[in-house]
């Protein structure tokens, strides 16, 4: 049986990596991941103002894959440049709004809140991820924490990025607010 390979392009942030890897796994693809870093000037410009060239990437890489799955602003131009060079030899998928013409990609998978529409756009309710039904089924008891029948409140907190970085004081303030708003006698709090 032919095994399709995918090249995954992201900026290396966990939220993006989990989406591209989740899609690759769901499609049954073997994959390799490249964290994209653009050269200094091009790093500052939005994709719609950036020329389409593989020369904008700090580190060159080969593409021996039939599928490219990209996610994030910095992966847009390398994905389009590879499609331009390889044409129909590859199938390009971009996750999230690429902020450029949708025609540059074979498929775009975008959450509803990005509010983009097109013949090649598949809309999701939220971010895609790498969890499978089997993993969820195998771990059903993992969060069996509500024996007291309290209201469950879950907080899914992302990691640091260019807009926000956590320090000990911020984490302490956040947890204090959560504990104040959702008292332990009435709520069971899950923080991920």
Language model: regions and residue ranges:
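Glycine-rich phosphate-binding "P-loop"
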Residues: 36-47, 155-169
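Extreme N-terminal starter segment of soluble prokaryotic enzymes
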Residues: 2-7
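Glycine-rich beta-strand-to-loop/alpha-helix junction loops that act as flexible
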Residues: 71, 157-160, 192
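Donor-nucleotide binding loops and adjacent catalytic segments primarily
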Residues: 149-150, 163-192
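Alpha-helix C-terminal capping segments
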Residues: 24-27, 61, 143-146, 181-182
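Active-site and donor-binding regions of nucleotide-sugar-utilizing enzymes
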Residues: 8-129
């Amino acid at each position: 049986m032919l095994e399709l390979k995918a090249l995954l392009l992201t900026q290396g942030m966990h939220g993006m990596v989990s989406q591209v890897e989740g899609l690759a796994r769901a499609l049954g693809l073997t994959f390799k991941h490249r964290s994209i870093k653009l050269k200094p000037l091009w790093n500052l410009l939005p994709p719609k103002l950036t020329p389409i060239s593989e020369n904008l990437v700090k580190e060159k890489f080969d593409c021996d894959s039939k599928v490219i799955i990209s996610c994030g602003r910095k992966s847009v131009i390398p994905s389009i440049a590879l499609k331009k060079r390889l044409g129909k030899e590859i199938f390009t998928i971009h996750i999230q709004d690429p902020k450029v013409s949708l025609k540059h990609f074979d498929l775009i998978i975008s959450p509803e809140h990005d509010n983009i529409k097109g013949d090649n756009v598949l809309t999701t309710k939220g971010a895609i991820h790498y969890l499978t039904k089997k993993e969820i089924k195998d771990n059903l008891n993992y969060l069996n924490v509500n024996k007291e029948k309290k209201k469950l409140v879950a907080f899914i907190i992302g990691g640091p990025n260019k807009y926000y970085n956590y320090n000990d004081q911020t984490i302490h303030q956040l947890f204090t607010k959560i504990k104040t708003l959702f008292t332990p006698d009435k709520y069971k709090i899950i923080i991920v």
